[in-house]
């Protein structure tokens, strides 16, 4: 279902875990974030992108390697993929097997292939900036929940893609380290100081529309 939509931003919400997938339109490109989870949901996102894309390039941002965030990547084979350097070092087969186990348990068939995307743009440090015409994406490493997470800030819209952090519904699961998690949360002040954030989108739960909600 669509959790939120305006002329440039559409937030899709899965029936599972309140997982969000985001499509951002600018005059320069389409940005797709973590398309997931169920086949019909992934197809809805793909069909929406196809309907509005025109001749614009598609950028696929994968915030981290949890299977539920990569399961829909195969629906966008033409996209330029952005992910962290640590994401690239994972064992793809292990992560895809988690998705297969889920699908087998619930008798799920997918029309789009399960694939672990290879990053075309690799985030290795905070502040990496990707400029596409008048659209700019700034990336930050976001370790703690996993060791391969990233934040993305999309400007001039002021959208902060937060991955599995700053959720209003999800317990803060830590699979990397608590020190990493704290360091990632401490980047909140830096991001808010360096960017005018109008909308924060967590990987699970509801979007926040003010700094008061974010903090």
Regions found by a protein language model. Name each.
Residues 1-47, 151-164:
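Conserved beta-strand hairpin/beta-sheet module of binuclear metal-dependent hydrolase folds
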Residues 36-37, 95, 171-176, 212-214:
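Short, solvent-exposed loop/turn segments at secondary-structure boundaries
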Residues 41-129:
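Active-site HxH/HxHxD metal-binding segment of metal-dependent hydrolases
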